Structure formats: C-alpha cells, structure tokens
Amino acid sequence: MTTGGPTPDRPRAGKQRLDAQLVAAGRVASRSRAADLIKRGLVTLDGRRLKASDRIDSRDFPRLVIDDHPWVSRAALKLVEGLRQCPDFSPRDQVCLDVGASTGGFSQVLLDAGARRVIALDVGHGQLHPRLSGDQRVLSLEGLNARDLDPTLLAREGVTRLVSDVSFISVTKALDPALRALAAGAQALILIKPQFEVGRDGLQKDGIARDPQAALDLVAAWLQDHHAGWRILWTGDSPIVGGDGNREFLMHLERT
C-alpha cells in the first residue's frame, strides 16, 4: 500500500470521483498519478478494480488498497512470488521466453532478476511497455500466436527458461510448441488460470471455476500424455486473484 506522497488530508465529504478523492486524501500526489495507478488496475476496493469515474466516500477508504509497485503491470507480482518460491528457476544469465507478454510485467521481472535476454511473445500489437520495447535485451514478437511459434527460433536464441501468462486459451494449446522445442535442462514457470482449462461445464454462471484444483490435474495429465520429458517440481497459489475473481496457480517444470 502506498505510504509516501503529500501530507495526508481527509477525503471529501460525500461520494466523489475516485481520482479526486485519492488526491484530496493525500494518498497520491496528483490527479495524473492517480489516473496512472487506476489505469494499471492498481486501485481496488474489496478486491475489485476501480475506474477513475467510480465514486467513493470516506467510509470506503479503510477497504481501499493501492498496490503501488515498480512494475509495468500488476501481473508482475505473480512472477515475483514464483521466483521466491522456486529459487532453482533463477533466470540470471539465461535467455528467457515470455509467452503472453502483454505489457511486459513478467519480462521486466526476468530482466530485474538478471536475465541476459528476453523474447516477449504476444498475439496482440503495441502492448509492450516502452520501458521494455526500448530495452536492447528484449526481442519483441508482436502479433504472433504462441501455437505458431517457430521451434528453431528457441534453439537459435538458446532459450533455457520459459514463463507464461496467457488468457482465453489453455496452456495445453499455447505452450505445446515451446515445450516440445526446449532442450533437456530447460525450466518453465507458468501461470494456470482454471477458467481457461476446465471448459464451460466446469464454470459457474459467474465464470468462476467450480473446482480450481481440477485445472492442475488436467495440465498434469496433459504433460504426462504429451510431454513426458517434463516433470512438475512445484505448484502453488498465485499471490493475486485474477481480475474476474478466479483463483490462479503457478507451476514450476523442468525438462529432463
């Protein structure tokens, strides 16, 4: 939670726009700073991401959280926790592939942890933060579906580490080419989102997975059937619940 900034004041009486209230209460230094934090999804109330136009009052402030951090995206915190839990994954001096890079939160964490080079792959265009797209250590592969990844690229680049945060597609589809291409000794640290693994029958009406643990079982079975050379070293909860409220998991793999 943010602790720096101007001397705290009191929120304005009655319901006011979120960005104005943050400044009035001294939680941020300016409306532009508030707008940036809100745009990046870092301001939440009872776990729900807020918009600048949302109206709050002083009674909401005890439940308001500002996850101000140095990363270009909130998702970076998921990989930060993964690296803490899996020190053997260390990306230091390694060439890493980031599947589903988006704005580059995972890529940024890898570079901060000493990665020599990061290949940031995403099916979208223009999403990678300038801090990453302007870094000579980053090779951006925009507009590329992970299922169409050229396996020879990984060999040419000498990729030994894989991270992934994909949405609207199962990891069993998105990561198949990369897992096949990586050589013995390679490691992967992937985010598993149950809502994209269990199928429609496994979801409640609100889109929450009925049995989140089932997603881990499905991925484990897929690995055993199609990627027997990969073994699971660790699984654990992501420190952040997905934006839609779904529980998420991290899985650490190694190719033998």
PLM segments and residue spans:
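Core SAM-dependent methyltransferase catalytic element
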Residues: 240-256
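Conserved class I S-adenosyl-L-methionine
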Residues: 91-102
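Short, glycine-/aromatic-enriched active-site segment of Class I SAM-dependent methyltransferases
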Residues: 194-210
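Residues at the N-terminus of the alpha-helix immediately C-terminal to the conserved SAM/SAH-binding loop
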Residues: 102-107, 124
